[in-house]
Amino acid sequence: MKKVLLTFGLCATVLASNAQNFSSPTWTQTQTVYKQKSDAVNSAPVTITADGDVIVSSSFNTGTLSVGGLVVRAVAKSSYIQKLNAAGTSQWAVALLGAAEVKSLTSDTDGNIYAVGVFADKVTLTTKTGTTAATLQGNSGTTKSSLFVLKYSKDGALLAYKSATSSVDATVGASEKYFYDASEAAYVRSTKAVWANNKLYFNAQYTGVSSLNGVELKGDYLDYESFMYVDIPRMSVLSVSASDLSGLTKEYTVKSDLSGMQEQAGVSSLNFAVNNGTLYVASVATGPVIVETSNKTETLNAGKDGDSFNYGFIYSEVGSTTNNKLFDGGKLATLNSNNSINDLLVDDSNVYVAGTYNTNNVFGQSVTFQGGSDSFVAAFAKGTTNVQWVVNSGVNEGDATKYAEKVTGLVVADNKLLLTGYTEETSTHTVKDGFVYNVTTSGTKTSAGSNVVLGLASDSKQVVTSGVNELNSVFNGYALSNTTGINQLTETNDVVRNGNVFSFEKAQDAVVVDLQGRVVLRASNTTNLSVDNLVKGVYVLKVGTKAVKFVK
């Protein structure tokens, strides 16, 4: 069996994968970014463009930052976005000066880059030379309660930007029944962005009242025993035009059903994926919630166990119709909830959902967790709401009242899933240990090390990781082995293309993957394969031992 060994620079531990054969990184990009270890942010998103370039981001607060030709001084805990080529050589960088944190990066087929994240107060967006490109104004104070959406060209020019800032509903604020700090209680945030269908999709959690491109985003308020108003967040998958970030469509929303509600409940976590025009969403909620799309409105409720709300794990497919299914997870098995959806991934047959849980069931499967919570991957058959399998980490991180697990990445490397995350001390969010698992597409799990990986991306040529070592951000690239033939990207005589149909000299198995390594099409024992239903983009066709890169 082949193995992947991902060695993280100065780190002593080693991370292994059942996908390829790496003994060391092919490149490493390291930058001093923090004044002290306690300043570190447990988030450093990465993505790989259609051309194979690598886009990374990190927070920084260490005086002057010099990276990729950019020289700037930190304002509060700022962030930067950097472009590297496929070999890890810096191309350019831009900064977000102020209390800003990039949560997710994605790109389109032209190499344009999109970023979503959160910020507080005032943030200056710089050019590659450090001059001001634009300014964002959010709520005053230090709480990162405002949302930004950014678009850059492949050369680092700021092409478009949007922001949203929330405030307390005027009627609620004037009622003398609202006792929260408005700068903390009213927020709009995002943690994931995906480019697809010439749209930019991103998730959003929001309370209070805000708007983006003239469309209102409004949370709910529970009038608790007619004594006080309590904020109840909504969560949505939103989309804007990828060309200029204009317009706003609520593709999918989960909100609380407030009728008769006497206790605080609602949606707490949501993630999504988009594939061939279909939106896939998974979320976690308690109490009665309403799921809204353009073609369906449905109320779902996991109910109660005695006086305690059960946790509902919700899975949805949204296309010309909407199919929702709620799985009763039961009540909490510990004092602290750690039920979350952290990533979704789609191949030609399945949708993979990654997250954490500490209930008795997760997506209908009774899987016993260890310690404060377990990480999991669940597989759903595309076109249905049927669970194929669920695997859990089985990591016992210790005292359930003090520790929990966090999932940081789920990608495909050589047709296998790579799941990364870490355990943390919940009161301070201090990282304790890392974990890495290989999961086959049939649900077999293999433990693969204990490195702390904060960000993860892959394409057909390499896996890219991010992390923090002492005061430094560390980005590593690991080339995929040539033994799979994935790097043999030339058309051969026995693989012939005619329009959107590939023909083969003899019947054999064929697989098409995108540049993120995801399987998007598969056929067995065939002499031809149509790619007519694929969206426009760059793909790799693997036939037997050969591979052909093509553009649809």
Each PLM stretch: what is its role?
Residues 476-508:
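Residue-level detector of functionally pivotal "anchor" positions at catalytic/ligand-binding pockets or at interdomain
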